[in-house]
Amino acid sequence: IKDEDLLRLIDMECFCWSVMPADRTPMINAGMVFSDRHAGGINYPKGGVGVIAEKLVAGLEANGGEIRYKHRVTNVLIEQGQAVGVRLADGEELRAKRIVSNATRWDTFAGEGSAQSTLVGPEHTPAAETTWRKRYQPSSSFLSLHLGVDASVVPKGFHCHHLLLEDWAEMEAEQGVVFVSMPSLLDPSLAPAGRHILHTFTQSDMRHWKGLSPSAYAEKKQHDADRLIDRLEALLPGLKSAIEFKEIGTPRTHRRFLGRMGGSYGPVPANRLPGLLPMPFNRTGLKNLYCVGDSCFPGQGLNAVAFSGYACSHRIGADLGLNPWSLPA
């Protein structure tokens, strides 16, 4: 491919999935992007994306499982070199035959670049985690806005999704690409009559939000949100005056409420890697402890993370002798 505009478009499409340009996005992930967005089209769950989580919960509970909300795990319990359970913030201990961490590897294992408090201490962190840290680094987080707007500002024929970038050279820059989604265009039940929901976000690194006093943080939060809204006026003239509800999320918001180091979207290669092969599968070097999510094969993105969960369930089933076949270790 020689056409510069087409190459930039491919970079942008890959960036939407992996927050990396095409030359650092594994082919399998890039294939999912173009298949989903151009060949098969996209789908929204009726009732909002939260319906996916609700259905998963219903399935787990129907099979005898239990979910405890607002119960923070502080440690993985390790005895005789193997994981045997978890300790909660209130001191309660829960034990099981197999333990699964859906936290990032920086939040799960101690080591260089890890979160201040990890689930597994340095004395039990496998050596392979040091190698992983040399290959991957955390991507940036996001500045996100959830807006409730008067429907009169939305022109007829407005699309559900938009990407806004004024300068191709700024694609990977702080607050470069603006992602816009208006799901109430497809599912009017998501918003009151005469209103629309607008979700917009742009990449933002934690280093720009550190060391701020409460007043300075509030000021930057509002300033950056206003600047983002100003940019959106190119798509929706009059947007600012049509906003009736506004909720702002920053990298600090994502760190606090999602439990992710630096609010990171996930791992990206520190250097160019040979595809997905260096990305570990679900087993870890600590017996009976598994990892799942974007720190495992096949990486970032909803489809990829869902696959890692599917793979992990089969891996554990095989290790427990519950299914006759398994995916790679």
Predicted regions and their residues:
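Helical element adjacent to the flavin cofactor pocket in flavoenzyme catalytic cores
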Residues: 33-89
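Active-site-proximal substrate-binding core of FAD-dependent oxidoreductases
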Residues: 78, 317-329
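A glycine-rich dinucleotide-binding beta-alpha-beta segment and adjacent secondary-structure elements
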Residues: 7-18, 175, 179, 238-298
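Conserved redox-cofactor binding core of oxidoreductases
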Residues: 1-53
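Mid-domain catalytic core of redox enzymes
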Residues: 74-192
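C-terminal segments that line or cap access tunnels to active or ligand-binding sites in enzymes
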Residues: 150-255
